[in-house]
Amino acid sequence: MKTTRLLMTAAEMERDPETWLTLRKTYITGTDAGTIMGVNPWKTPLMLYHEKLGDIPAPEVGDSDAVHFGKVLENVVAQEFTRQTGIKVARRGIMASLYDPNRAASIDRICLNTDFPAGLECKTTSAFKAEDWADGKIPPHYYYQCLHYMAVMYGDAVGNPVVDGAGWYIACLIGGNRFIYRHIPYDRQAIKALVKAEDEFYKRLIHHEPPPVTDSANDEKLLAALNQGTAPAKSLDCGMEELIARMDDIKLQIDQYKKLLQAGRNELIAFLDQSDTAVGHAYRVSYKMRKGREVVDMAALRKNTQLYQALRDAELLKETAGSRTLIIKEAKNG
């Protein structure tokens, strides 16, 4: 049973990246899945929401060396996967679900000679990220990306039967010299949970209802960029005042732990005495003198108006963009 239609071939995606970017913005895609599930280490649901609405620019495809070389090495990863497994693969392009017009999949490869439906996701990463793949692990955002592809390609969101053994492969070149691959088995319950979360996110887009903020500092940066503070003052309701009270309690606990931590540092430094190193069974401690760094006395520089202006004219002095600062104080009664 046919479950998808082809939106763009792989060759068309290379020739027309602007249309590709537009499609990625229009549909819920595989790279969105991990973000929607809250496991993307670089992007929050709120960031994705505002990207989809065009409030903030989405990262350009190929706008970094990592992305560029990831695409260059995609063929290498696919070829090595075939060499090690004997499974032939082919490029396909962007596929849209026939059963859900809001979901699409920009898949790297389709597997051709398996006894069950399968695809291949090709990844590259640095040696510093090797631990993310150790002992059979798969980074969670990549796991959900592959589940999304299965949801689109197999049409299970509407209850279509799926062939036994169906799944998705993911292969990764680590540090340029280590190759691994994993098979992600088809998991009906996990896919249904993902589809439900994606549908709820899409409804938020339609109704312009932002997802809740997370504990990520990225959300604070995003909100500061979106909201310039030009509206009239607001009244704090009971819920917000209770939130501030909880924050005060947390800050008090943090202060207490900071004091305990500082006491521990002081005791350790006192133990070192005139030594700059101490070694034990579990830990190694160093307390060495660092070279001082040069600093600019801005107050003195501004007094030398001629030199100060010359540095600004030469663009050796630059002013950063202003930012909003959150300050909480007790209200004055009466």
Predicted features and spans:
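Accessory terminal regions of nucleic-acid processing enzymes
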Residues: 1-334
